UniProtKB/Swiss-Prot annotation:
Keyword terms of this UniProt record: DNA recombination, DNA replication, DNA-binding, DNA-directed DNA polymerase, Early protein, Hydrolase, Multifunctional enzyme, Nucleotidyltransferase, Transferase, Viral DNA replication
Catalytic activity: DNA(n) + a 2'-deoxyribonucleoside 5'-triphosphate = DNA(n+1) + diphosphate
Stored SMART domains: POLBc
Function: Catalyzes DNA synthesis. Acquires processivity by associating with a heterodimeric processivity factor comprised of the viral OPG148 and OPG116 proteins, thereby forming the DNA polymerase holoenzyme. Displays 3'- to 5' exonuclease activity. Might participate in viral DNA recombination. Does not perform OPG116/D4synthesis across an abasic site.
Chain's gene name: OPG071
Family per similarity comment: Belongs to the DNA polymerase type-B family.
PANTHER family in UniProt: DNA POLYMERASE CATALYTIC SUBUNIT (PTHR10322), DNA POLYMERASE DELTA CATALYTIC SUBUNIT (PTHR10322:SF23)
Protein name: DNA polymerase
GO BP: any one term: DNA replication
Highest taxon of source: Viruses
Keyword Nucleotidyltransferase annotated: yes
EC number: 2.7.7.7, 3.1.11.-
Length: 1006
């Protein structure tokens, strides 16, 4: 029997079992049940003394146990690490057992199961059926997984089944209540193992009149009275709410491979199951594959107060307890963890994922026709957009113009769409799927048949969006890749944090190397310095800036320095200069390079003046070996990705290489995380110290380098910054560039693993050509060992606000001057939620203007400053006098929470007062909108005091009174503060700011 593993899960009844859900080549689903064990590692001496004897035991052979406590010394008299060798046993017990002196107890039982039996969680196997006992059709028991799964076979493709769903609930206030508000719609996108896709929506007929129901039937809707009458081929079905809920129960109890929702764990599934129990007393019941255990669908919460989010809200995740092998997947939770977005609402996520440039085909009266294909945007973007358009009802044009779809024509790689839209002047516009321009509260207030049918379209679109996002993020291949890499079940891949997922690969490595790492002392945590961030040399750059990044800097630092808890010889600290001098002189004699590397770190305690960590590089340590495995596997999958021919293979290999990249980059963080199995304080701080020296070394050879006559003269000798080696240190290097090229280079900024180097040219093509040659020369001549850099991009018209804050037009390494550059806003107000739309629009306008001025190159920095400030004053005065912009542009949002230090915090007071006077109260954890409002007769206010008292909560019913105005000065001051930080002339900026606002601006720290 050939099977592919698709999920592993446990039953937690009286008899615990582990189950595998697998699929055969013919699409048949097979479940295999295994005994569940708890695992313990003990020495032979303890094993022999156990009474009663272990249930099962396997010999692990001779293993080396190393004490990895850090040795801190004030001199070079460092004691050797404690190390012992003994025969070890792996004990399997069906129930928890207290065994003294058991080791390796930090690893998960499921990881022990996979590794001890030689099973890959996502592997394909030809099963030896003599080790299988049939329980029922499609379910077998296996007591010997090692022999049953002994024959691994090449991966083969299998079909999967999915249920994507969304619901709409009636509400008259802010949130629906399960006790009083019925479900009005449930929409499903059902994909079976044959690949057949069914789209259907159930409409609650109890919210319609009998006349409307009859009209709906006349218009093609199916009306049913019971579950038995359901026809899944019909798109629209009318039924009572009880029938609607029973159909949901029937669907959710099926064994799909995936049931996918958006925030469904917290809302949709919970609402369905609670409403079902309330109206019928029935529950959604899952049964284990052997049919011996039944559990009710239940949502349980996991609160991690140690990982508090914004405003002190605990990180809460929601989980479905099922035992039938279906993976209940919440896209909302997944995207929150994997993407950094301004908002995690479904419309914001879809806007980010599905957009493309569309060409204007026709302009009519209040309507416009757009066409999109591979000629209007990058290949594939129009096709992805067109797929979503099949169920889409609204399209967002140019970021914020929401237009209703009138007609649409869709083909394989493109689309044509007619939108209800004001006439727009340009020939091309960005089209995206954002928020539908509907007010659900008002729709329920005016509810009738037409509205019910409209809502059905919105609901099925949201259900389909779950499918589109599922495919866009490649969740299925990421799940399989994670299971293989982390040695975890598919259902648990996204449940754990990095400190847990690393345990599987670490255990695998320790068993391969016959190593056990133990600690006898309590882990101590001290702060340490992070990566090197340079101060920007200036604000605005008319010349191009070349961006070079170290490839996997921290993983390669760990490999280069052999940084690992067991390779740490010790840490030498000094309390005075004399002690430090003596230690420095003797260190290199006792621990000579390259076998040893000595790393100067910042002292861990205030009474120390120096701290030096010493690592032995003769035998590769656990962390470097782990990282080398990850990086080698990533390189292997990247190579396979290039050679892959099918889209399935490409998706799998891309997910695998990405997963290895993520896990490799997480190792550095885990070295400094006290609860991690890889915790090593000295290794973590040595990693950042070596990383800082590497970025300083690269900056030192590039800053002041010159290219002329085909020769590149680096600014400094190419000397290894850690120890002398036999490399050629001559800074003059022959290039393959034309001999008439004459350029100078200047380092202008750097951050952790990247260097920004200005070239005195505005030619994009030449800049890219030179940067690629620089990349080759740096990797061949400047860098050493396993360090490599990569030319990432040319930044044109770079505007540096401060460290980690900049705006630029990016030309990637694979582009040219004719390519459309990407606008990058890193760490700036355009990416923040606590900034008004007015502010974002204005700052975007002024950055664009600055960028154009830099491109033209006609003005010096003083002229640019004068021109920008003069224009800004005109714009602000004009807005203040006309007061024409709508209130929506000035609204801000904030999350309501109670984690304030002061009991009378003004934010809390604002919400409390609002809740006293409004029936729709603001709940804890909810975002609310507010704006600064003052009396209309208040003149321009220079000195802003007590601005919190002008905050006013903006709800649906708020209207700006004739005796009120927007307190523009608050917004203007914040905007101007950001703009003056873009300009180079501080004197002019201070003068302008004092004249407008009566105070000096705050300049960002360089």
């Amino acid at each position: 029997m050939d099977v592919r593993c698709i999920n592993w899960f446990e039953s937690h009844g009286e008899n615990r079992f582990l189950y595998l859900k697998s699929r055969c080549r013919n699409g048949e689903t097979v479940f295999i049940r295994f005994p569940h064990y708890f695992y313990y590692v003990v020495t032979d001496e303890i094993y022999q003394s156990l009474s009663p004897p272990p249930f099962n035991a396997r010999p692990l052979g001779k293993m080396r146990t190393i004490d990895i406590d850090e040795t801190i010394s004030y001199n070079l008299d460092i004691k050797d690490r404690k190390c012992s060798v003994a025969d070890m046993w792996l004990i399997e017990e069906p129930k928890k057992r207290s065994i003294q002196n058991a080791t390796m107890d930090e690893f998960l039982n499921i990881s022990w199961f996979y590794i001890s039996n030689g099973i890959s969680p996502d592997g394909c196997y030809s099963l030896d059926e003599q080790y299988l006992t049939k329980i029922n059709n499609g379910c077998y028991h296996c007591d010997d997984p090692r022999n049953c799964f002994a024959k691994k076979i090449p991966r083969f493709d299998i079909p999967r089944s999915y249920l994507f769903l969304d619901i709409e609930c009636h509400f008259d206030k802010k949130f629906p209540s399960v006790f009083i508000n019925p479900i009005s719609h449930t929409s499903y996108c059902y994909i079976d193992l044959s690949g057949k896709r069914l789209l259907f929506t159930l409409i609650n007929e109890e919210m319609l009149t009998e006349q409307e129901i009859q009209e709906a039937v006349d218009r093609g809707c199916l009306r049913i009275q019971s579950l038995m009458e359901m026809d899944y081929e019909r798109e629209l079905v009318l039924c009572s709410e009880i029938v609607l809920l029973r159909i949901a129960k029937q669907l959710l109890e099926l064994t799909f491979d995936y049931v996918v929702t958006f925030n469904g764990h917290n809302f949709d599934l919970r609402y369905i199951t609670n409403r079902l129990e309330l109206l019928t007393g029935e529950k959604i019941i899952f049964r284990s594959p052997d049919k011996k255990e039944a559990v009710h669908l239940c949502i349980y919460e996991r609160n991690q107060s140690s990982h508090k989010g914004v405003g002190g809200m605990a990180n809460t995740t929601f989980h479905v307890n099922n035992n039938n092998g279906t993976i209940f997947f919440d896209l909302y939770s997944f995207i929150q963890k994997s993407e950094k977005l301004d908002s995690y609402k479904l419309d914001s996520i879809s806007k980010n994922a599905f957009s493309c440039m569309g060409k204007v085909l026709n302009r009519g009266v209040r309507e416009m026709t757009f066409i999109g294909d591979d000629t209007t945007d990058a290949k594939g973007k129009a096709a992805a957009f067109a797929k979503v358009l099949t169920t889409g009802n609204y399209v967002t044009v140019d970021e914020d113009i929401i237009c209703k779809v009138i007609r649409k024509d869709i083909w394989e790689n493109g689309f044509k769409v007619v939108l209800l839209c004001p006439t727009l002047p340009n020939d091309t516009y960005k089209l995206s799927f954002g928020k539908d321009d509907v007010d659900l509260a008002q729709m329920y207030k005016d509810y009738n048949l037409n509205i019910a049918l409209d809502m059905a379209r919105y609901c099925i679109h949201d259900a389909c969006l779950c499918q589109y996002l599922w495919e866009y993020y490649g969740v299925e291949t990421k799940t399989d890749a994670g299971a293989s890499t982390y040695v975890l079940p598919q259902s648990m891949v996204f449940e754990y944090r990095a400190s847990t997922v690393i345990k599987g690969p670490l255990l695998k490595l320790l068993l391969e190397t016959k190593t056990i790492l133990v600690r006898s002392e309590t882990k101590q945590k001290f702060p340490y310095e992070g990566g090197k961030v340079f101060a920007p040399k200036q604000k605005m750059f008319s010349n191009n800036v070349l961006i070079f990044d170290y490839n996997s800097l921290y993983p390669n630092v760990c490999i280069f320095g052999n940084l690992s808890p067991e390779t740490l010889v010790g840490v030498v600290v000094s309390t005075n200069r004399l002690e430090e001098e003596i230690n420095n002189q003797l260190l290199l004699q006792k621990y000579p390079p390259p076998r040893y590397i000595t790393v100067h770190c910042e002292p861990r305690l205030p009474n120390l003046i120096s701290e030096i960590a010493i690592f032995d590089r003769s035998i590769e340590g656990t962390i470097p070996r782990l990282l080398r495995t990850f990086l080698a596997e990533r390189a292997r999958y990247k190579k396979m990705l290039k050679q892959a021919t099918s889209s399935t293979e490409k998706a799998i290999y891309d997910s695998m290489q990405y997963t290895y990249k993520i896990v490799a980059n997480s190792v550095y963080g885990l070295m400094g995380f006290r609860n991690s199995a890889l915790y090593s304080y000295a290794s973590a701080k040595s990693c950042t110290s070596i990383g800082r020296r590497m970025i300083l070394y690269l900056e030192s050879v590039l800053n002041g380098a010159e290219l002329s006559n085909g020769m590149l003269r680096f600014a400094n000798p190419l000397s290894n910054p850690f120890y002398m080696d036999d490399r050629d240190i001559n800074p003059i290097v022959k290039t393959s560039l034309p001999i008439d090229y004459r350029f100078r280079f200047r380092s202008v900024y750097g951050d952790t693993d990247s260097v920004f180097t200005e070239i005195d040219s505005q030619d994009v093509d030449k800049s890219i050509e030179i940067a690629k040659e620089l990349e080759r020369l740096i990797n061949n001549r400047v860098l050493f060992n396993n360090f490599k850099i990569e030319f990432e991009a040319v930044y044109k018209n770079l505007i540096m606000q401060s460290k980690k804050k900049y705006t630029t037009m990016k030309y990637s390494a694979s582009s040219n001057s004719k390519s459309v550059p990407e606008r990058i806003n890193k760490g700036t107000s355009e990416t923040r939620r606590d900034v008004s739309k007015f502010h974002k629009n204005m700052i975007k306008t002024y950055k664009t203007r600055l960028s154009e001025m830099l491109s033209e190159g006609r003005m010096n920095s003083n002229q640019v400053c004068i021109d920008i400030l003069r224009s800004l004053e005109t714009d602000l005065r004009s807005e203040f006098d006309s007061r024409s912009s709508p209130l929506e542009l000035f609204m801000l949002s904030r999350m309501h929470h109670s984690n304030y230090k002061s009991a009378d915090n003004p934010n809390m007071y604002l919400v409390t007062e609002y809740n006293k006077n409004n029936p729709e109260t603001i709940e804890l954890g909810e975002r609310y909108y507010f704006a600064y409002i003052c009396p209309a007769n208040v003149p321009w206010t220079k000195k802003l005091v007590n601005i919190k008292t002008y905050e006013t909560i903006i709800d649906r019913s708020f209207k700006l009174g004739s005796d009120q105005r927007i307190f523009y000065e608050v917004y203007f001051k914040r905007l101007t503060s950001e703009i003056v930080n873009l300009l180079d002339n501080k004197v002019l900026c201070i003068s302008f700011f004092e004249r407008m606002f009566g105070s000096k601006p705050t300049f960002y720290e360089a």
